[in-house]
């Protein structure tokens, strides 16, 4: 029996997207500005999307590669990333309003995101549109989507309860106001909504403030936000972490919300595995990470990209700084194989090495 030819997982993904026959492919990733941007975050939220978007463009497709930065979230960081005193003072405050933890930048978000932005060119990331959730919440499309969720809150509560198992109270309003006084966006509560004037009446347990805010000043419950972003941004492809992939889990609940509440089809998805350090998943807020902007100081950017592309998205990857020389050697070997200097006995392994080397070099070795 003739063996099937090797097809790289990036190309398999592209072929699936081509079969959808959409006018424009909107390839989306998300980045939580909760702490340092580590290399683990970029596996499934940046490099996977970049490879797929690039190949689609090469095939003549209209493509938009997006990266959503979650700036409308509350501060959740904990020691050792921050001091207990800093955590006590700022926990629950919208991260855009949290000061720089080192006093060197304008705010928390800039402190962690600017180093990431500065090295994108070195990693060959081109044609990337970066948008923040704060900007999205100001848009007319998002405000209308918030109003839809408020109007259909009973149905939304039923869907969330079906998947999450949590019961929301009868007076639940799926909108978390941003307190204009202390910038709390974690424990505030909307107690009434005026849809005509697009305002929510709120109470803030953190500082005791009460009043009204516009629907552009706050955020949705995160599962509703996820589905809302699909709708507002017209997302057609979006990978997601394996923690969301379990049957009946968070992505399934968002799919149901998209279809049953918003009346849209969810984007094609792809689960990916985290990157680990010493058996623990890399975590910005928990301080277990290797910063993305540090990588070009110790190895070629293509080395990291090759590691991610030669491995299938759900492959468990264990990282240590001591592993960098090995990863560099593997990339150098792939280069020799690609240019015919070295041979590999197993055809599929050789084909994977060659194709992954191409992708790591933006299809232009």
Set out the residue ranges of the language-model regions.
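N-terminal catalytic cores of NTP/NDP-binding nucleotidyl/phosphoryl-transfer enzymes
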Residues: 1-83, 227-248
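Flexible loop/turn segments at secondary-structure boundaries
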Residues: 33-36, 72-76, 137-139, 275-281, ...
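Residue-level signal for inorganic ion chemistry
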Residues: 38, 149, 300
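Well-ordered, non-membrane alpha-helical segments in soluble/globular domains
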Residues: 45-50, 106-114, 247-253
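Charged, often glycine-rich, active-site loop that binds/positions anionic groups
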Residues: 72-90, 145-146, 281
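A glycine-rich helix N-cap at a beta->alpha junction
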Residues: 86-124
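Active-site cores that bind ATP or allylic diphosphates and position pyrophosphate for catalysis
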Residues: 126-293
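Catalytic adenosine-cofactor/nucleotide-binding cores of aminoacyl-tRNA synthetases and other
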Residues: 246, 251, 273-365
């Amino acid at each position: 029996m003739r063996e099937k030819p090797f097809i790289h997982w990036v190309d398999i993904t592209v072929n699936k997207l081509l079969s959808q026959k959409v006018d424009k492919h909107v390839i989306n990733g998300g980045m939580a500005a909760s702490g340092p941007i580590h290399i683990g975050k970029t596996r499934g939220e940046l490099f996977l999307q970049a490879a797929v978007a690039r190949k689609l463009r090469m095939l003549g497709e209209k493509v938009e590669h997006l990266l959503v930065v979650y700036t409308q979230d509350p501060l959740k960081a904990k020691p050792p990333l921050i001091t207990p005193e800093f955590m006590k003072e700022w926990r629950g405050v919208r991260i855009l309003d949290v000061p720089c933890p080192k006093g060197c930048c304008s705010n928390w978000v800039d402190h962690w995101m600017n180093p990431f932005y500065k090295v994108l060119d070195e990693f060959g990331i081109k044609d990337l549109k970066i948008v923040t959730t704060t900007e999205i919440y100001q848009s007319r499309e998002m405000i209308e989507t918030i109003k839809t969720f408020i109007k259909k809150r009973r149905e939304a509560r039923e869907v969330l309860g079906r998947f999450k198992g949590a019961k929301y109270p009868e007076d639940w309003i799926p909108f978390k106001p941003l307190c204009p006084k202390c910038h709390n966006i974690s424990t505030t509560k909307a107690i009434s909504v005026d849809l005509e004037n697009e305002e929510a009446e709120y109470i803030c347990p953190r500082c005791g403030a009460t009043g009204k805010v516009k629907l552009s000043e706050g955020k949705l419950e995160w599962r509703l936000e996820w589905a809302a972003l699909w709708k507002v941004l017209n997302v057609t492809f979006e990978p997601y972490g394996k923690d969301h992939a379990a049957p009946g889990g968070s992505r399934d609940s968002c799919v149901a919300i998209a279809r049953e509440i918003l009346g849209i089809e969810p984007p094609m998805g792809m689960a990916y595995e985290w990157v680990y350090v010493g058996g623990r998943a890399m975590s910005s807020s928990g301080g277990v990470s290797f910063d993305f902007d540090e990588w070009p100081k110790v190895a070629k950017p293509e080395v990291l990209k090759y590691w991610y592309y030669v491995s299938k998205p759900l492959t468990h990857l264990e990282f240590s700084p001591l592993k960098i020389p090995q990863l560099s050697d593997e990339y150098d070997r792939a280069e020799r194989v690609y240019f015919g200097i070295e041979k590999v006995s197993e055809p599929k392994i050789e084909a994977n090495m060659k194709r992954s080397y191409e992708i790591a070099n933006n299809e232009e070795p």
